[in-house]
Amino acid sequence: MNSNWNSIRGEKFGRQSWLVIITALLIHGVQAGTLLKRIHVDHAFRYQGNEEWEIVIHGNDGDDDLDPDETVMVVFDRPFPQEGGRATRPSSEQWNFLGVAGNEDVWIIPQNFTPLIWPGWRSEGAFATYYNDDARLGFSAPFVGISVENVGYSGLGAGHYSMWSNQTGGITKVWISTADGISEDDVYYFSSGHSHTNQGFSDPGVYRVAYRATGFLANDGGDPPTGTRLVASQLQSFYYALGTYAEWKATYFEPHELVGSSSSDPVPEATRYTGDSDGDGIPLLLEYAFNLSPAESDYRVLTPDSGERGLPSVRLDESTAQPRLVIEYLRRRAEGAPRLSYYPEFSSTLESVWAPAGAESVFPVDSIWERVVVVDEAIEHADTVRFGRVRVELR
């Protein structure tokens, strides 16, 4: 996804000219949901009788329950398992269900404990024991099934979701994989009332995964028993933000604004890369790139030498014998895994090829941001007209 800075400044010595290219989409602002980053919670499905279910994000350790429609679980785009969820897929074919090729990145919420986001599975209700003839089971227990019925995704990749368990003896039991589509086999069964699985995501972005719980309230008393009186919950979506850009968007927008309500729906207008939810003329991707807010109209240009937010500053430096065009801009530091590339460029005309800037000077601002200064070295004589811009690419 490429997006060019929407203000291009040109300088001719003795006069200044601006060319401003702005496309504004006026969209009402929204309020963000709750972000979960370092906490043990559960996807909780509570059968309350009379065909009624309560579905919440259960807070363990005394934490309050949360509404899944107002909550986003965040997976950091940092190395697994100590810092985040980004791992490398093994080359063996048994891992094809992850939806990425061998030795490529995949993002994981682990089955085993992590101090980062650690969502488990919880069922509550008087469910009956029955024999489950699923090839992955083949025994009797009071199973509850959690099926995936659709997955929405907003990002640059394919957006595949998977779930599997690590079994005794090194066995990997795959429950759900959307890499080959969604079928009636994409169900996770558990019987303990509480459990954990591995969850996999093929790409950074925002995922909306819609689950449905099922269970039997009775059985026929046979040997083995057959379940009777099947009950099924309503379909409930849970939201996951994978990576820094997705987390940033979730800070400002409600979960339903981050991704379509079904796998076939487009990304909501407010959170498209080119969206302008606050009506200030700055596309969403550039708000992310230059430390601006998509929730308030805060159009500004960076203050040279001291600014901490704003679009790139393009100015004429006349402190030397040969004046030079200077671009100064904010850049997200690589340590924060922003998946952004910044390309400062110069040109003599808006119609010609833009040339990349040369050497840069970098000044740290804080743990997230740094200030970058580049100088145009291509000016040949005093009547030269030069333009500067910063092009931004999300990877």
Predicted regions and their residues:
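Short tyrosine-centred short linear motifs in exposed loops/low-complexity segments
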Residues: S195, D203-Y207
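N-terminal secretory signal peptides that target proteins for export/translocation
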Residues: M1-G14
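Phosphate/adenylate-binding glycine loop and adjacent helical scaffold
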Residues: G33-G193, T228, A241-G243
